[in-house]
Amino acid sequence: MSTQEATPRDDAIRLLARRDYSRSELMSRLAARGHAPDDIASLLDALADEGLQSDARFAEQFVRSRLSRGQGAMKIRAELGARGVTDEVAREALEGEAPDWHRLACEALAKRFDSPGRDPRERAKRERFLASRGFDFEQVRHAMAHAWENTR
């Protein structure tokens, strides 16, 4: 069966067999394959009812994946939002993992840099690194003060 002959359900099942997708991502991918928007909407409702597609499950897996990469809450929340996950579902997924954000920021910083830096320019570079990873100001300050305590 070629992609042109595949039903929206066939395409959705094929996509979901590889990994979870948010409802929004799945809708975009099915629309790109030429399926009618009305067919896609009813299919996504049916898949959710059957437990085959869940934004909550997608968000939980996404959060675990991003935490293992050393990313902060702000970046994870923004990426989930870009994938069409609601703020409430994103918040619940982050709370479900309950990571120690300060420890995670310290680990990410110590892994990337071997010292806090000798001058303000080097310290600013380290702070920008953590901010780009999605850590907030308090977490960045904590990491700059404590990231290398166990390595000395």
Swiss-Prot record:
Q: Which UniProt keywords apply?
A: Cytoplasm
Q: Does the keyword Cytoplasm apply?
A: yes
Compartment(s) of residence: Cytoplasm
| BP GO terms, sorted | regulation of DNA repair
Q: What InterPro entries does the record point to?
A: RecX_HTH_1st, RecX_HTH_2nd, RecX_HTH_3rd, Regulatory_RecX, WH-like_DNA-bd_sf
Q: Name one Pfam family in it.
A: RecX_HTH1
The reply on keyword Cytoplasm is yes
Record's GO cellular component terms: cytoplasm
> Which domain of life, per UniProt?
Bacteria
Report the protein's function.
Modulates RecA activity.
**Per the similarity annotation, which family is this?**
Belongs to the RecX family.
Q: What is this protein called?
A: Regulatory protein RecX
